[in-house]
Amino acid sequence: MPRPFIEQNVTWLYSDDLDTHAAFYRDVLELPQVLDQGVCRVFQVSPTGFLGVCNKEGRPRGTKGMMVTFLVENVEETYRYLLGKGVEFDGPPNMLGGRTVYSAFFKDPIGYWLEIQEFNDPRWPYPPGRGPRRG
């Protein structure tokens, strides 16, 4: 039997301050909020990818061991845009992984690590019409 197709995915982050956490993704990163469940809010990251922030009883605690990476078409452009929105980065964009990854890191208001990233690897399943930008 073949593996059933996975249509969409949601990454969940947990918070003690749901309003501040949700406002960052809605107002700073400008992700459209697609669902408000009261204790959880869900934002659309891409046509099939979603990010949820939650404050509910019995939830996992802490931000270590978790990072969300947003693959973007142009890291420098996104970096400048987010700087203009007040985002504080860990440093400027940098080439990593033997020149296969170009990225910059920052934290959301709760302390989760976030990354904006471009892959520079022809093996990556790029969106239609795209491929590595960097030589």
Language-model segments: which ranges?
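Conserved catalytic-core motifs of GNAT/GCN5-like acyltransferases
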Residues: 32-37, 94-97, 118-124
